[in-house]
Amino acid sequence: MLSFLSSNLSNTRQSIAQVLNFALVLSTAFMLWKGLSVVTASSSPIVVVLSGSMEPAFQRGDLLFLWNRSPRAEVGEIVVYNVKGKDIPIVHRVVRTFPEVEGKKEKTVKEVTVSTPTPPNMLLTKGDNNLADDTELYARGQEFLHRKEDIVGSVRGYMPMVGYVTIMLSEHPWLKSVLLGIMGLMVILQRE
């Protein structure tokens, strides 16, 4: 009777240890992601290129590293932005910048002096592989992007083809289920 209790207690302890190890891995990954978000000032410091609109600069499946601490974006800079109402990051190049416009209906432009802080800039973007600019991609009635509101970050580095795994998982939902099942079995069957 005593041996039965000790074996059950041992199995229970081992199961709890496995669950805690799994929770530790998840929480560590979450903390690393949030820490990277704070350092880069970007809600999504790493993104995957989902289309071929930036070829030849970036291919579909490239993993991009973003930085969002610059107050302005310049012409030629590659930025990642989200369209209002949609949560799909778009990677395109800035082709034009505008000064902040006050009273658009009156067509007056705010005068910028040396003592005035740099106004937030507005951007027009375009994919390198696209024929037209992105005004058709922006939200209805939006003619440009606001640097602070719409930009997720500027591209500072990339790793080719590493993000293709993410694309495969989103295009083939059954593959995601298979991988999660295999990972779950590995956690359950792991013995220390």
From Swiss-Prot:
It is an enzyme of class 3 (hydrolase). Residues 178-189 are annotated as: C-terminal short (CTS) helix. The chain crosses the membrane at residues 19-39. One of its GO terms (molecular function) is serine-type endopeptidase activity. One of its GO terms (cellular component) is signal peptidase complex. It catalyses: Cleavage of hydrophobic, N-terminal signal or leader sequences from secreted and periplasmic proteins. Its EC number is 3.4.21.89. Residues 40-192 are lumenal. It comes from the Eukaryota. Keywords: Endoplasmic reticulum, Hydrolase, Membrane, Protease, Signal-anchor, Transmembrane, Transmembrane helix. Its main location: endoplasmic reticulum. It is a single-pass type II membrane protein. PROSITE patterns: SPASE_I_1. GO terms for biological process: protein targeting to ER; signal peptide processing. Residues 1-18 are cytoplasmic. InterPro entries: LexA/Signal_pep-like_sf (IPR036286), Pept_S26A_signal_pept_1_Ser-AS (IPR019756), Peptidase_S26 (IPR019533), Peptidase_S26B (IPR001733). The keyword Endoplasmic reticulum applies. Belongs to the peptidase S26B family. NCBIfam families: sigpep_I_arch (TIGR02228). The C-terminal short (CTS) helix is essential for catalytic activity. It may be accommodated as a transmembrane helix in the thinned membrane environment of the complex, similarly to the signal peptide in the complex substrates. Component of the signal peptidase complex (SPC) composed of a catalytic subunit SEC11 and three accessory subunits SPC1, SPC2 and SPC3. The complex induces a local thinning of the ER membrane which is used to measure the length of the signal peptide (SP) h-region of protein substrates. This ensures the selectivity of the complex towards h-regions shorter than 18-20 amino acids. SPC associates with the translocon complex. PANTHER family: SIGNAL PEPTIDASE COMPLEX CATALYTIC SUBUNIT SEC11. Catalytic component of the signal peptidase complex (SPC) which catalyzes the cleavage of N-terminal signal sequences from nascent proteins as they are translocated into the lumen of the endoplasmic reticulum. Specifically cleaves N-terminal signal peptides that contain a hydrophobic alpha-helix (h-region) shorter than 18-20 amino acids. This is Signal peptidase complex catalytic subunit sec11. It comes from Emericella nidulans (strain FGSC A4 / ATCC 38163 / CBS 112.46 / NRRL 194 / M139). The lineage of its organism: Eukaryota, Fungi, Dikarya, Ascomycota, Pezizomycotina.
